[in-house]
From Swiss-Prot:
GO terms under biological process: apoptotic process; mRNA export from nucleus; mRNA processing; RNA splicing; signal transduction
Positions of the UniProt region annotated as Dock domain: 133-167, 227-397
Top-level taxon in the UniProt lineage: Eukaryota
SUPFAM superfamilies linked to this entry: DEATH domain
Similarity section: Belongs to the THOC1 family.
Posttranslational mods: Expression is altered specifically during apoptosis and is accompanied by the appearance of novel forms with smaller apparent molecular mass. Polyubiquitinated, leading to proteasomal degradation; probably involves NEDD4.
Motif Nuclear localization signal, residue numbers: 414-430
Gene: Thoc1
Official protein name in the record: THO complex subunit 1
Region feature (Disordered): 194-221, 533-569
Pfam families: Death, efThoc1
Biased segments, Basic and acidic residues type: 553-569
Keyword Manganese: no
Functional note: Component of the THO subcomplex of the TREX complex which is thought to couple mRNA transcription, processing and nuclear export, and which specifically associates with spliced mRNA and not with unspliced pre-mRNA. Required for efficient export of polyadenylated RNA. The THOC1-THOC2-THOC3 core complex alone is sufficient to bind export factor NXF1-NXT1 and promote ATPase activity of DDX39B.
Amino acid sequence: MSPTPALFSLPEARTRFTKSTREALNNKNIKPLLTAFSQLPGSENEKKCTLDQAFRGVLEEEIINHSACENVLAIISLAIGGVTESVCTASTPFVLLGDVLDCLPLDQCDTIFTFVEKNVATWKSNTFYSAGKNYLLRMCNDLLRRLSKSQNTVFCGRIQLFLARLFPLSEKSGLNLQSQFNLENVTVFNTNEQESTLGQKHTEDREEGMDVEEGEMGDDEAPTTCSIPIDYNLYRKFWSLQDYFRNPVQCYEKISWKTFLKYSEEVLAVFKSYKLDDTQASRKKMEELKTGGEHVYFAKFLTSEKLMDLQLSDSNFRRHILLQYLILFQYLKGQVKFKSSNYVLTDEQSLWIEDTTKSVYQLLSENPPDGERFSKMVEHILNTEENWNSWKNEGCPSFVKERASDTKPTRVVRKRAAPEDFLGKGPNKKILIGNEELTRLWNLCPDNMEACKSETREYMPTLEEFFEEAIEQADPENMVESEYKAVNNSNYGWRALRLLARRSPHFFQPTNQQFKSLPEYLENMVIKLAKELPPPSEEIKTGEDEDEEDNDALLKENESPDVRRDKPITGEQIESFANKLGEQWKILAPYLEIKDSDIRQIECDSEDMKMRAKQLLVAWQDQEGVHATTDNLISALNKSGLSDLAESLTNDTETNS
């Protein structure tokens, strides 16, 4: 009999793996682990899970014994090697990192995180990325919660940069898709006027002056203030603006907007009245900039009343405030997908924002040093930001295009377009000619024979119109000499014969008279027609009278309902018809040739059905231009099955005419 295979024993396997892990750490070689893994009985999953437990057990002992960070990192490096050799699960190194960062103090976490930063290429590899990205994100967020934003600024920045390097640009977890604001960023300042020392400070400065004490800046280093008169009201209004920069949606509220408008005008007036010169900048700061010295600053404002005068005299501080204005204005004017439909600026607000934006750019250009260059750079960056805003509104599609599965590119054979490929492909089964105007003309009447039979294509004049002049000349009372009569004109005679053949029965009736020439024959026909047709006017019309009659006829045509309906649709008509269209706007949209992307944009912009209907009609008007007429709109309504609305629009048009 064959011997029975050995069964897997968890305690024995764990002891063996723990011993092998210690040996591998001492030798700095993974071979002991590989040997133990191959010799132990059991399935691969059982051995992997046991080795994962062994790693965590060894790491726990090192943390309890307060071992150096190098020993801890050696265990994690060994686990990375184990994943590469397929002897432990891919999530093991990340679990170990999480355990270490949870147990060690912040100063040692800095060393551990340096190791994490150096191995970013490892984390992004196919072996580790899918299994570890959520662990790393959770680990970094937990670490950020432990860190102080004011004392550990650099460490927090390193974590954010690491996440930016680890995840692709289109990663949803870091995009703030719903455009939320950091409402926790509250700027605290003195709101009790009784505790303010601004008035006392300025009084003492005027009477006694300010002495330079030991430890303060000397004459060479102290920036000269711009002598801005600061009181508590200016201090309070200035720092109150930070709440609007923190939460811009307050500007859509009527009362809050008035407060923001008032405070902003006062603060910007102070910036305009008290401008800074290059000489007011700190000499020490200027020397550091010239020599390439490191310029370190902290983004959180200091709101002490004692610093207000120095802050307003600081060019960098002014730039911060003016930049906040520009960012706020860009949000208020921009199209944000998740912005509520109620958040709409009035014309007055839009005009004020436009004027104030110009003033802010002007203040930036006048602010030293290199104000003009800085202003242009900021304007360029904010213009570029519009592209990112559009990308975000579209759902942040990935910039990376996936390769086709076939390695060999197949040759694309261009098929010659058949008539069926471009005839009747539009939403209204339109024939696409390739030009907007030609397409419109071609589709006025799809049936060519019916178009030829249309009354509008009847160019042949009536007998009365054509022979009116000849009948007047044939009247003896008018005394027109024979040589000046129209019947003597050969061109007129040729056209007269063709018209008589089409419209007069006398042309085919036999006659006993013998005519020597065409003028004589036409003279005889004119006399016959004069007896049958209504009598002409008593006076021979002059050229001016004919022009006046033509103008009157043209005016009458313009006053006719058909011509009125051929005029472009007005804003009042759009407003009135949108209320009737309502929820049926989406049925009409394809028949107005509105693109699917525009329809989706209309749905995102507003939840009100009447507003969506109005936006649809406005988009159609912008698309068609002068061809956006009520007649074309009625035609589209009939084709879409909305005949009731088409009849209502027809009645409204005739009533208004």
